């Protein structure tokens, strides 16, 4: 086993969605939806893809917010250290809501589910949905009231584009 750069034949490569673009899409929506001007991002671990999503998220939110006449700032990213601790998601979301965050995005799997639980509880306590989450592909069913969209990458299309590039030289 090894990595693509260690491959001895030139026919091996890897495909990876552009994490910063994924973050940009989420950030653009966050910039439009935030009322408080404060947004939040929860990461599982400090990975390049997670950092890319966070950078795109905060950059796009600030840009789109400015275009809409408001200032949008992202709280510092927090990391749970894993991808399964829903209790950390609850803890992080509560702390970030206490700092005014009203739109969340994450890259932390089950930790994100915990965050959505805390967001839904805060919304229920206030009597209306005013705090939102931009979810991941596993959340397509919209099982939480706070979900305003779900980020989905289409790996079949990625492979198709790659094959077209190979065919065209």
Model region roles, listed by residue range:
Residues 1-169:
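A residue-level marker of the well-folded mature domains of exported/periplasmic proteins
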């Amino acid at each position: 086993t090894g990595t693509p750069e260690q491959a001895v034949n030139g026919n091996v490569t890897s495909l990876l969605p552009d994490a910063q673009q994924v973050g940009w899409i989420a950030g653009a929506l966050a910039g439009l939806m935030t009322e408080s001007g404060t947004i939040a991002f929860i990461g599982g671990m400090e990975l390049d893809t997670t950092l890319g999503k966070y950078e795109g998220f905060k950059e796009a939110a600030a840009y789109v917010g400015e275009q809409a006449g408001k200032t949008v700032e992202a709280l510092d990213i927090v990391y749970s250290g894993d991808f399964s601790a829903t209790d950390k998601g609850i803890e992080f979301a509560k702390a970030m809501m206490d700092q005014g965050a009203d739109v969340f995005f994450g890259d932390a799997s089950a930790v994100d589910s915990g965050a959505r639980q805390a967001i839904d509880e805060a919304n229920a306590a206030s009597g209306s949905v005013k705090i939102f989450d931009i979810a991941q592909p596993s959340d397509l069913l919209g099982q939480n009231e706070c979900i305003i969209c779900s980020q989905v990458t289409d790996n079949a299309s990625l492979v198709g584009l790659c094959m077209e590039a190979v065919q065209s030289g």
